[in-house]
Amino acid sequence: MAQEKSQGKSKGKPKEKSKKDAIAGMTREQLEEKLRAWEESELADFITRQPESQSEYKTASGLPLNRIYTALDKGARGDGAADIGLPGQYPFTRGPYPTMYRGRLWTMRQLAGYGTGADTNERMKYLLAHGNTGLSVDFDMPTLMGYDSDHAMSRGEVGREGVAVDTLADLEALFDGIDLTEISVSMTINPTGWILMAMYIAVAEGRGYDLNKLSGTIQNDILKEYTAQKEWIYPPKPSMRLVRDTIVYGARNMKRYNAVNISGYHISEAGATSLQEAAFTMCNAIAYVEEVIKAGVAVDDFAPRLSYYFIAQADFFEEVAKFRAVRRVYAKIMKERFGVKKPESMRLRFHCQTAAATLTKPQHQVNLMRTAYQALAAVLGGAQSLHTNGLDEAFAIPTEEAMRLALRTQQVIADETNVAAVIDPLGGSYYVEALTDEFEKRIFDIIEQVDDMGGTIKAIEQGWFQKEIADSAYDYALRKASGERPVIGVNKYVEEGETPEVETHPYDPETEARQIAALNKVRDDRDNQKLSGLLDRLKTVAGDDSQNIMPITIELVKAGASIGDIVESLREIWGTYRETPVI
């Protein structure tokens, strides 16, 4: 009676369940017996009357799925609590920060990039006016590949799929009227990433900014170019030197800046599974860390500013598990393999983008829903920043309206769904924890396989990553063609005779002429004799692996050197890379 009275006074508290009633309180044998009895009675009888739609279920990466997950499954039991952990604590499964979105929402970082610097500046200000909380810049193919806008290889491509940048003047126009100490800027650039970083520094110094107050990211991940995106200039060894030099320079001079953004996104877009995306990205990370350590820099001095970039694909729970698992894997790699001491060095921070390759031309309005679910997976997986794709990106770069709707998608998730109120709300789910554990195990298996080949560079040179991605892409294409992998509007619920009516982003045919005119003006105004001397010094520095290439590059861009000037000078020293075909 006394116990009953005590419970009665505890108004609002649920009564404690007996261990016999609570599954978690059962012994393993009792739970196994309960599950077996359910399968043999209710389940078996029901399936005879209503068979399941598939004989077996798998994730998009091919991981087998149970019908139901219980406390019996690995990772769902109490002995996995150490690996699940708490947010902001090792191994960071539940998030890199103690308060996550309760303290600060993810950065809403919609991409912008087309035409000239002035054109993209206008789009960035439009996005800021509509609630964008970070900036992200895409560059055109000539800028990416190191060609000036008047080069023969640039014809027809200037400003078409990103902003055209030839000289420092273009970057000054790009960020005109934007305080770079008040907003973080991400620049999606790889083979010429060190030059764009030098230009960014030059813009900041020209405005009198303290470099340690700049926050932002340069993608600068050349390894995934060799395996996935296929945009490179130089062979792997000098290319790794460029990444190393930017990381070292950033660590010593820009305490809040991420000088590399190690990217799984492009690996996925090339056809890799989510498991491969996560594992291959970790292999690349290991290679970069080893490269910087070889330069004599202590890992805890640069690791806190390593950043990551992942995709949010269509398989919702697999994506959430991927994000959670890769945080844990990274923490263990940094602690156990590299011996880091700082928690910040073990903490994986990532930008996320919804999956462009899932966007379709047929029934393109459905892309809004695809993107929304992918964005929700990114948020539930704990992303630090997010770009949501425009519904029209299967046709062209997005219009202002498409970008506004994509941004509103994030804002609805942030402000209307209340999902940001609880940290890692799917944590503790038997299914999510089991899938997270399985992802972790398989990621480490792939890392071990690459280690056995001699590391990431050796695996690239052997074409191993490339073949793995190609095989996965082919498998997905077959499954989509057969209908095994449904795509609404493409192989399911197809509307015959549909003619998409969509207003695409227009390309201004005068962009190329305007950009070339601006380039020629810089060439006319600069001190070409001084420039020639600086380019000679660049070659000397490039030939001496002990020197950092960033200071001379900063001098060059301040002197009016174009990207093409710098790239062509280094071709004379390092040559160009030719990929061995993968059979």
Labelled PLM ranges:
Residues G296-P304, K332-R337, K341-M346, V412, ...:
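Catalytic or ion-coupling anion/metal-binding cores of large enzyme and transporter domains
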Residues N132, S154-K294, E319-I333, H364-A372:
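Active-site cavity-forming subdomains of large catalytic enzyme subunits
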Residues E33-N66, A71-G80, M197, K237, ...:
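Gly/Pro-rich turn-and-neighbor structural signature
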Residues M1-A169, L174-D179, A204-Y209, E448, ...:
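Acidic/polar, glycine-rich intrinsically disordered N-terminal extensions of enzymes
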Residues L196, G271-A279, Q313-A325, T354-L368, ...:
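Short glycine/threonine-rich loop-to-helix capping motif typified by GTGT followed
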Residues A129-L135, G177-I183, V203-S215, V248-N258, ...:
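Secondary-structure transition/capping motifs at alpha-helix termini
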Residues W106-A112, L135-V137, E161, I183-I189, ...:
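Hydrophobic faces of well-ordered beta-strands that scaffold small-molecule active sites
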